């Protein structure tokens, strides 16, 4: 979703008065390991980086967005979930299944085999690739 403030305002409009909003979304720490390594490798080989991972909202920004949309008494919590994959292809397959690939509207340079090979080496620890998914939960009342 590229326009979160508008989404929240629309949700507030369609919700019944005094109803509870409960929503979950991936937070700013999601895929941080992958994102850092991708950026470092692309800068090294291409002199710049393409947007490959959707920008995620951090917990502080989530609170501000909820309040700016007019919801009241927000409670926001986050939990980091660590997921292990056996290789980079399995990770990419799961991301595709979650709808988290090619979700940026801007065009990026395709990943080259050289980059993916080095990326897998940098991310692999004890024959596993560990990634973090931050799950942010928001509850707030519509006045």
Name these PLM-found stretches.
Residues 5-20:
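A short glycine-rich, Lys/Arg-flanked "PGG" loop and its adjoining helix->strand segment in the class I
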Residues 18, 22-86, 102-105:
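Conserved catalytic/acceptor-binding region of the Class I
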